[in-house]
Amino acid sequence: MESLKSPVFLLILHLLEGVLSESLIQLNNNGYEGIVIAIDHDVPEDEALIQHIKDMVTQASPYLFEATGKRFYFKNVAILIPESWKAKPEYTRPKLETFKNADVLVSTTSPLGNDEPYTEHIGACGEKGIRIHLTPDFLAGKKLTQYGPQDRTFVHEWAHFRWGVFNEYNNDEKFYLSKGKPQAVRCSAAITGKNQVRRCQGGSCITNGKCVIDRVTGLYKDNCVFVPDPHQNEKASIMFNQNINSVVEFCTEKNHNQEAPNDQNQRCNLRSTWEVIQESEDFKQTTPMTAQPPAPTFSLLQIGQRIVCLVLDKSGSMLNDDRLNRMNQASRLFLLQTVEQGSWVGMVTFDSAAYVQSELKQLNSGADRDLLIKHLPTVSAGGTSICSGLRTAFTVIKKKYPTDGSEIVLLTDGEDNTISSCFDLVKQSGAIIHTVALGPAAAKELEQLSKMTGGLQTYSSDQVQNNGLVDAFAALSSGNAAIAQHSIQLESRGVNLQNNQWMNGSVIVDSSVGKDTLFLITWTTHPPTIFIWDPSGVEQNGFILDTTTKVAYLQVPGTAKVGFWKYSIQASSQTLTLTVTSRAASATLPPITVTPVVNKNTGKFPSPVTVYASIRQGASPILRASVTALIESVNGKTVTLELLDNGAGADATKNDGVYSRFFTAFDANGRYSVKIWALGGVTSDRQRAAPPKNRAMYIDGWIEDGEVRMNPPRPETSYVQDKQLCFSRTSSGGSFVATNVPAAAPIPDLFPPCQITDLKASIQGQNLVNLTWTAPGDDYDHGRASNYIIRMSTSIVDLRDHFNTSLQVNTTGLIPKEASSEEIFEFELGGNTFGNGTDIFIAIQAVDKSNLKSEISNIARVSVFIPAQEPPIPEDSTPPCPDISINSTIPGIHVLKIMWKWLGEMQVTLGLH
């Protein structure tokens, strides 16, 4: 049975939780409502695909229900259908559902370049993911032998997405040493199976007998895989291998394998997946059901033309700080460039009342855009009635279309204590409201409108040189348009000039963009002198000046030349800003994009806000970019953060194209804006991107009628960056609100060093331990810690639970380096304390100058393994064997490096990744 409308207007308050995910999902009486599964623009029309999606969710719901102790099930799902597909009577217009906030994206290829199911997740353990990626072939059941049934795999990915748990297998190293014996990485450890040698040639693999232990390393030799037995008694764990028939549960505290070197142990402090799920808000607000849940219902929604109404404040306070004119400058950019061709746009202004400046007009030409620009307000007076503006905008939209799925861009600088009176109307409208708070006095309730409708919330101060207002409007591309239609910001900068000074610089137009390129310049008093040259040195003419609005713009015809576009702008005693935007040069070549994310839209001091920027070209991550966040407070103070992709501090995974940093420099309560700058340069070497962490398990093989059968080799995406990258991007990251910041200066130091997450250990000889890690800071990942506490134990659980009483290592002479630096430290184990086969676990805690301590680091592990002696070789035998060097990397727990010389000299090195 299908419901014709998606009840998205009910899915409101959950959006207050945070913004790592823009999901509309709400948990209502144990059922997940508002799930959005979007079929990407590149997927050819295929009605069977819709049925495949329905079948997967319908079959997954009871599996999820039983796996979670009768707590959760899938209640209703909206399937978002591309505009290019043929319209049908059962397809209705979306409300708040967009491709941008989709929970599941169905695309012809996954971000891995193949059919592997995968979940985007950039946050910490327990934080929600961004979205799940599936392919049509996977949904059609064409990958059953590689990934297992679609419904079970979907529940596996749902756990990544909704509860922030991680895989309990290891795709890179499938075995580890425990008490001197090799064990398959699995959870629970009660899962039984065969250790088989897999031989692959071309596109097929066969089994080649039982695995053999390497007498030097203690691990199995290369090409050994663990193949689970078909009949098991163990019910866990879904995050290990949900394809095993008996597996219907998550690992719990009782059966969790804490020693296994997997991401769940590494990222979640050895906790089981069920322990993490139990700490989620979902779990806390539910109790087990006593009856079976109903089957999911589905709504089929088809994307249509974009419908936008500008709702602009022209009250008396807009005279302050030239706000009315600045609003018109930013609105001009939106109308000229940001809003996509073919969109319908209207305009309403408001003070104490509201006024229709333009009914909905379709933008099919430059003349259509210019006509709307002429309706921008020129006079400001009166009070502020935000609800009047919204009601009038709904009326304007309803004259042409239903308000479902329409958008409102609401800008205001004033207080309005009646704004909550139209909240119900907004919820019922099905419209998405983007809010722009201008200046320090904008209504504090303003963000509620964007939060309850899934819109973008932005903030601009009156510091004109930061160009925040233009950035806010530049960020308002459609959440449903294909990326090739999006306006992409290449540059945004401003400067205060004196005495005929110049603003000089260059903008990079890379090969992925160049269409509809626009240079927009604003000033505050008199028109400046403007020079722009293309990469060939040809001066550009054709600037259009509007001295009333104090803006000039140049639209580059055709596709802009690739290279450096230079500019020189001269002025005196005023502020200039420059904004450059463009679009994809080709519909077939994805443009390089920057997607900013903050982990919360309300930050309560002293909890830090985490700023992320994902830089990609299509599905491929962009590495080694220079990425900076500019964060501006309500006081006008700006803080510049270098975002890093180093796998330390706020950054979860090294070299995945996601750049991260903690923000702790709060100076006041109120709004903070976020802006990202990204610059790519020449790469001097081939840099390999890290594979995504939350991939579905590829099944190496299975047992059928007592025989082991092997799958073809796992499809691998190299993600090798082997070309020069030269690009520039700017993007607004929206805004967040800080609360609980102390009013009195100086603000107390309440921020400890961040957790060390990349501790690695190795042992040389029989007693020299080498440690490496990335230095934390005094305040999370900023500054310099004061000292380190290093402790060790032969019990991984004791070290975690009783760190303060574990054996402490002498760290005399260890002086912490600046945050993000590499730390190296060596210490000796005492005498013959640890015998052969002993596992030694090591962890670090950082301490700052206020004696605030970080969380305990990830736990590094070394194992003392002494190979059996070979019988002596007679003197008349062949010459001694040459040196042997063996390296085996085990991400998540240990790096094993063994060097053995025939003369009896031995080095055993084990360390943690």
From Swiss-Prot:
Q: Give the main EC class.
A: hydrolase
The terms describing its cellular component in GO are: extracellular region; membrane; microvillus; secretory granule; zymogen granule membrane
Q: Which residues are glycosylated?
A: N504, N770, N804, N810, N836, N887
What does the record give as the active site? E157
**Is Glycoprotein one of the keywords?**
yes
Say what happens when this gene is deleted: Mice exhibit significantly increased bronchoalveolar lavage (BAL) inflammation consisted predominantly of neutrophils; have decreased goblet cell hyperplasia as well as decreased mucus production; have decreased airway hypersensitivity after cholinergic provocation with methacholine.
Q: Which CDD domains match?
A: vWFA
- Entry EC number(s): 3.4.-.-
> Where on this chain does Zn(2+) bind?
H156, H160, N167
What is recorded about the protein's domains?
The metalloprotease region is responsible for autoproteolytic processing. It can also cross-cleave other CLCA substrates.
Q: What is the similarity comment for this entry?
A: Belongs to the CLCR family.
PANTHER family (alphabetical): CALCIUM-ACTIVATED CHLORIDE CHANNEL REGULATOR, CALCIUM-ACTIVATED CHLORIDE CHANNEL REGULATOR 1
The entry's protein name is Calcium-activated chloride channel regulator 1
Question: Which organism is this protein's natural source?
Answer: Mus musculus
Its taxonomic path starts at:
Eukaryota, Metazoa, Chordata, Craniata, Vertebrata
